[in-house]
Amino acid sequence: MSGFKGYLSTVPVVFAIWLTFTAGLIIEINRLFPDGLVFSF
């Protein structure tokens, strides 16, 4: 089990999980609030 915990704490795994979380968050924000990059005054 300690080997698995050591594997999960490596930088590429943490980086991949972080990118997946960030991409999912951006996708959901764009799904709920589309055209967020367009400034409509």
From Swiss-Prot:
Query: Where in the cell does this protein reside?
Result: Plastid, Chloroplast thylakoid membrane
**Predominant location:** plastid
Topology in the lipid bilayer? Single-pass membrane protein
Judging by the UniProt lineage, the source's domain of life is Eukaryota
Is the Thylakoid keyword given for this protein? Answer: yes
Q: Which UniProt keywords apply?
A: Chloroplast, Membrane, Photosynthesis, Photosystem I, Plastid, Thylakoid, Transmembrane, Transmembrane helix
A single Gene Ontology CC annotation of this entry is: photosystem I
Return the Pfam families for the record. PSI_PsaJ
Record-annotated membrane-spanning stretches: 7-27
- BP term (GO), one: photosynthesis
Disulphide bridges: none
Family, according to the entry, reads as follows: Belongs to the PsaJ family.
What is the purpose of this protein?
A: May help in the organization of the PsaE and PsaF subunits.
HAMAP family assigned: PSI_PsaJ
Q: Could you tell me what this protein is called?
A: Photosystem I reaction center subunit IX
Name of the encoding gene: psaJ
